[in-house]
Amino acid sequence: MGISVRFVIILQFLACACAHRQPTELREIFHFDTSGWAHDIALDGDSLYVADRQGGFLAFNIASGYKAPRIAAPVRDVISLSPNSGRPVLASRFEGLVLVSPSGEITGRYSNGDIANAVEVRGDLAFAAYGLQGLVIVRIADGHARLVSGLPTTGWSHDLRLSHGQALVADWNGLKVVDIRDPEKPVQAGFLPSPATCISLSVQESGGSRMVALAEGHAGIALVRLNAEGHPSLISRNYLGLKPSDPIHPGSGGWVHSVAWAGHYLFAANWKRGLAVLDCAEVENPRVILELPSSGTALGVKTRRQPDGSYLVFLADGESGLRIFRFNG
């Protein structure tokens, strides 16, 4: 077979493969205009929780098609929450960590005068990103909250994820990795500085390897690899056309505030610019493949894989409320 004939066959094969490849699509399937500013999303089984700042928090049943949410506003300015198997622990701007019963009643609080920005629960321990107080660990039992320990940070602790025996903290100044195997004596295990503002993070594990995506405000997104000891190493970055030197909380434009993995895709809640989708199949070169404008302020994003291989994307869109999309990558 001649070279030219083989070349034609290869082109025909590639054309056929492209013709049968499902195009990338991001389609909105649900919108709910909350009474406050939708700030963060949490998923727990068939329950979808929205931290709605001035509107308290909302709980939707996913199986019912998100109809008739339970709206609870016992706390002022809910920034984030941990579902905690139907007993939510709220991170409140003014009231600290707040324990809520399944019926919506407040059963306990922990406050130290700073702002609780994010919380995750493991067993009877709540781990909080607590502003200038850094990482705060609280024991929750019988509806009460008691301080166990803390680890101050040099920046403003804004978000965290628990991964194995470590807490990964977005500390504005950078990513802090904390060994929490002894909750009474948390110890810093690693740190990676940010060129702008490290606001939020998302962790993806595969084959024993951990890849962390960082939302870094005007520095866009960063991809970071963690080794077993928790030492972070920067793999790549995409600035999304932003400038690290620009001021925080801009009145317009982008400022990456949250990220969420969806397979090898990464979703970035990019402030007034809406939702960005990046293809990270080549982790050394993440590239933007879609941008969806927002009528609000894109603040928090979570994803969930569906049986057909698509993803549901849940966006806390500030003054525009909750938006849900289906993504086919």
Pin down the residues of each PLM region.
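Feature marking well-ordered beta-strand scaffolds used for ligand recognition
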Residues: C18-G329
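Bacterial N-terminal signal peptides
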Residues: R6-A15
